[in-house]
Amino acid sequence: MIPVSLVVVVVGGWTVVYLTDLVLKSSVYFKHSYEDWLESNGLSISPFHIRWQTAVFNRAFYSWGRRKARMLYQWFNFGMVFGVIAMFSSFFLLGKTLMQTLAQMMADSPSSYSSSSSSSSSSSSSSSSSSSSSSSSSLHNEQVLQVVVPGINLPVNQLTYFFAAVLISGVVHEIGHGIAAIREQVRFNGFGIFLFIIYPGAFVDLFTTHLQLISPVQQLRIFCAGIWHNFVLALLGILALVLLPVILLPFYYTGVGVLITEVAEDSPAIGPRGLFVGDLVTHLQDCPVTNVQDWNECLDTIAYEPQIGYCISASTLQQLSFPVRAYKRLDGSTECCNNHSLTDVCFSYRNNFNKRLHTCLPARKAVEATQVCRTNKDCKKSSSSSFCIIPSLETHTRLIKVKHPPQIDMLYVGHPLHLHYTVSITSFIPRFNFLSIDLPVVVETFVKYLISLSGALAIVNAVPCFALDGQWILNSFLDATLTSVIGDNDVKDLIGFFILLGGSVLLAANVTLGLWMVTAR
């Protein structure tokens, strides 16, 4: 949930700004000087909205717009083609996203949920917590577009990345419009930045009369320039992300494991034998981990495959086991240990007569320095008198052996997703002690936000929807293509209106259902 303190600060801050503005504008003594100050600085204030416009950058914009005219002509021609394709493709993309959302809503109905409580401990043998998990159908839902709500599906500690990426994407978008307008001989009045509640953005002020006088194709180059620049920025971000290991090679190396950068206070991985900042994880069970992608894939495999077992000799099994009374849990699994034990785990195995038995064993002694297995046959390769013991845990709970040498292995008992969400990692390991382990994470996270938000700005703005770039792209496109075919402007305008209406309804449906999906959970 959104922290109450954040809401109070935002609402309180805007209240102070608006009331101060109102008092100064109502004051007999300060009214004229205050309004003159606002006008001279290009500032305007309204409820939850502040806007700043300046002509300081006009010289720079004109310099960029008049440099290498032929190259810019080709550049914005590419942008025009991209914009038209993106406008029509956005219908397909929004339609697909809407269908995915509806399918997810059906999958997330009450009948599709299953939950189980899981406990874990990180004292002498494992890490401890309790929680519940839902059906896996919603975990693998990947959508190109998703509604983002700060504090709900956007972590509060990543708001800085989010808003910085939003501002940069907006500035690049408007720079595209500004340069294209100057290239097409449209007067450029100024550039500005605004803040709406907590969302920053940018804008350019163009002379409307000039825009109306130029040809539809010239208008298309201007209107498509913003989303074209956002698309290029996203591509550059992807390139930077791919080349990041090479760029940071003199200072950081990769490919040997993942480095722990943060462990949440409520993480089940916290404990005397848990994970610590600076630990290098090399394996999850028998799954080798060389980078972040391996870590995620290993956790996915562990989560969606049956619990793996461990080979143990008959003599060790006899030595460690003791008489137990097995009973069924509510989810149908079997328990045979004291519920309050932090070191013992219930294991199941088949004896030489293929009869399933259960025994309570000290987890660390039972699984330490043993090979993994699925059946007794996997253990016969090393010793004829060995059994494959499998932890008898609740439905979504797993026992995971986390190798982080030179420390002793961590034994984690719980849902793999809890390990995923409460432990922060990086693939970059510093070559020198004075280097920060957080720097690559900061750079990588910011670039990912920049790619996502710049790409999203390109897609959403291309939608033929009222008040978005897509509206003006569509109008200019219809003027350029249908004027010679349809002589009646009213018919052409009617076609444009229905396309805009369809795009607006489609976008509104995606946003509404997306918000409902995010906030209703």
Swiss-Prot record:
Domain of life: Eukaryota
Gene3D superfamilies assigned: 2.30.42.10
Region of interest: Disordered: 113-137
GO MF: metal ion binding; metalloendopeptidase activity
Ligand binding (Zn(2+)): 173, 177
Residue ranges annotated as Lumenal topological domain: 25-74, 108-146, 254-448, 479-494
Glycosylation sites per record: 339
SUPFAM superfamilies: PDZ domain-like
Active site: 174
E.C. designation(s): 3.4.24.85
Membrane topology (UniProt): Multi-pass membrane protein
Assigned GO CC terms: cytoplasm; Golgi membrane
Cytoplasmic side: 1-3, 516-521
Keywords: Cholesterol metabolism, Cytoplasm, Glycoprotein, Golgi apparatus, Hydrolase, Lipid metabolism, Membrane, Metal-binding, Metalloprotease, Protease, Steroid metabolism, Sterol metabolism, Transmembrane, Transmembrane helix, Zinc
Any one of the GO BP annotations: regulation of response to endoplasmic reticulum stress
Family: Belongs to the peptidase M50A family.
Name this protein carries in UniProt: Membrane-bound transcription factor site-2 protease
Annotated organism of origin: Pongo abelii (Sumatran orangutan)
Recorded name of the encoding gene: MBTPS2
